[in-house]
Amino acid sequence: MAFDWFWKAMGSSPKKNQKKSRAVVAQADSSRYSGLSDAELRDAASDVVTEQSTSEDGHHFGGQVDDAPALLAILREAASRTLNMEPFDVQMQGTYRLLHGDVVEMATGEGKTLAGAMAAVGFALQGKRVHVITVNSYLAGRDNDWMGPMFDFFGLTHGAIREDLTADQRRDIYSRDVIFGAINELGFDVLRDQLITRRADQVRTPADVAVIDEADSVMVDEALVPLVLAGSEPGPAPAGRITDLVKRMEEDKHFHVSEDHRNVFLTDEGAAFVEKELGVDSLYEDEGELLVQVNVALHAEHLLIRDVHYIVRDGKVALIDGSRGRVAELQRWPDGLQAAVEAKEGLDVTDGGRILDQITIQALVGMYPEVCGMTGTALAAGDQLRQFYNLQVSVIEPNVPNIRFDEADRVYVSAAERNDAVVKHIVEVQKTGQPQLVGTQDVAESEELAEALLSAGVECSVLNAKNHEAEAAVVAEAGRPGRVTVSTQMAGRGTDIKLGGTDEAEHDEVVETGGLHVVGVGRFRSQRLDNQLRGRAGRQGDPGSSLFFVSLEDDVVAVGGAGEELQAQPEEDGLLPQKKVQQFVDHCQRVTEGQMLDIHATTWKYNKLIKDQRDIVNDRRDTLLDTAAAWDDLSYHNVDRAAELKKQGISEEVLEQAAREIMLFHLDNEWSEHLAYLDDVRESIHLRAIARESPIDEFHRMSIAAFGELAERAVNKARETFDEVEITSDGAQLGEMGLHKPSATWTYMVNDNPLSSSGGSVMGSIVQMFR
């Protein structure tokens, strides 16, 4: 094959995998099992796998499929009996590759959900606990209910983790064989379990396998998203006076906004202006706290845009998840940014919080011994999947050839000219009766387009972060004749658009018009996201078409083509029909994709060290939780105090737990302080880096030095507390010494920051608070 080097570079070898997978599936003859009773079919399943064993120290080993064709045939027969679904050969191929630990690419409408569920059964029959990971809780609950009868058939327990469950309910579900859950929910439970003081309070039971739906979205787009557990505590929010001051500052005089609109920089004149207005000698006093507040206010005022990054609803700021076009309830920004935006919008300002612990999604995925996944656009993410997860991509050909027609992009000089062309195009296509799905970049753009269409006499349905509750109903009817649906990012919607909508009688009518027509308004930051939108048309051999409208003012072109010149003569309506213009847009998108990969690689270098340090802290926590190590240390340190407590008749169990709580309190507190320190270091690393030493090297040096002192401080403070705290038969009275854990905690996600450069600034991080 002439391009073997290409597939290897992408972490893929599709031809080899396709040939082998087809050969195995060809041998999977379910008719051999159709005459068996349910009990006999279950027995047959247990005969073709070997269950894993557990060693004395609790580690699992073994567990394998002994006869793959037989297992696939049994799974196919079980799906037919329990779900009334006859899996296609391509779904069986997908299941086979998942069982081999690949990320499989299956086009929209090819049945990824069933393939993933059959793989989950295959893993569970080996005695492995399986987490089926989704992008949101709705899909987790839906798929658990939908695929549940097949798990029940094999006697496998299953359930879905939801954010409204109690700790006891979560503990019960985590003990089951197959658990469905949104990636953020599973991660938040990891964080909460890392703050327990009694092992019995742990809710999670470790899993052996992760089957990840929308794998590229979870493992690439959100790989470096920190999931954060925070405690109530005021944060560095800018005062109202600073917010008002920033509103009066002039761009290019007092501050500069970077060309890519990811950073804002205070000028010397701007710093002098602030110092004069606030009556301070220097912005850099008090460890730069005032400077931080000014920078936060500048970010809120000039980088975060209403109806793009957030909406205001019911007097509150609600953040928008740009990769999914949704609002996640109770979202937050960190570092006072939430309060700064609230002040900017004239709303009541809320308190910030202290980070107790955090973990990136990439580190969370890395906790699973086995990982596989499925998505419609895996191949384009193959390089990242190989580089960061050592995973291979297997491409599964569609069950019916894709006949969608993808027209060449139409590129315009300005966004206004592009938008005019979009409206005219939609009006013309609607006359044919062809349904249209129009993908926009953000909420504001979707609403502006909807208004323009209405003015042109076209009614449309709008699906964005402001009305995502209506998603199921809107998507269900998006394939009806003449229907126009305007939507923000379609990734993770989890629902196929069926031609004719819910009315089967209209299917043929829509087919005659050419099927679903997808219109893209601007290119997304990667071709993979463009393809996710295109992939909504042409499912299961249906006809369909797609066309993207682009302008030279679009973010992807402006950022990816920064500093480059393009000479081309536009037509009267602003259209640039030259082939070189199309090539330039493609180039800009590739540059943007490269920048994102650089940011991923650089940011992972920062987070990798934090992950390694967290692992050390967690190992220490486990020792303290599971042994009497805390009591042994503290009683050895102060023999007289230990003897006195025993004389009081306090049981050994109570004393061990009291010592455990003392030691864990200070360990957790020192870890939280360490995270805050690392945040500060990373914010200012470009200022602290010594000559000829890279910022990442300086960050490593400083973080390792600080971490080396963490354990010693925690132990010394624990010993001091043990000497002084009152310990009764009820345990250690830490509260009487003012050693309180936060009165309230919440969890949130910090999105992979679109406002920062690869240098690692996190000031502009977009955060999504979930609880």
UniProtKB/Swiss-Prot annotation:
- Could you tell me the superkingdom of the organism this chain comes from? Bacteria
Q: What class of enzyme is it?
A: translocase
Q: What is its main location?
A: membrane
Q: Name one GO molecular function term.
A: ATP binding
Q: Which key words tag this protein in UniProt?
A: ATP-binding, Cell membrane, Cytoplasm, Membrane, Nucleotide-binding, Protein transport, Translocase, Translocation, Transport
Q: Which GO terms describe its biological process?
A: intracellular protein transmembrane transport; protein import; protein targeting; protein transport by the Sec complex
Note the Pfam families from the entry: P-loop_SecA, SecA_DEAD, SecA_PP_bind, SecA_SW
PANTHER family per record: CHLOROPLAST PROTEIN-TRANSPORTING ATPASE, SECA INNER MEMBRANE COMPONENT OF SEC PROTEIN SECRETION SYSTEM
Family (UniProt): Belongs to the SecA family.
Question: Subunit info?
Answer: Monomer and homodimer. Part of the essential Sec protein translocation apparatus which comprises SecA, SecYEG and auxiliary proteins SecDF. Other proteins may also be involved.
Role played: Part of the Sec protein translocase complex. Interacts with the SecYEG preprotein conducting channel. Has a central role in coupling the hydrolysis of ATP to the transfer of proteins into and across the cell membrane, serving as an ATP-driven molecular motor driving the stepwise translocation of polypeptide chains across the membrane.
Stated name of the protein: Protein translocase subunit SecA 2
Q: What is the lineage of its organism?
A: Bacteria, Bacillati, Actinomycetota, Actinomycetes, Mycobacteriales
Q: Which gene encodes it?
A: secA2
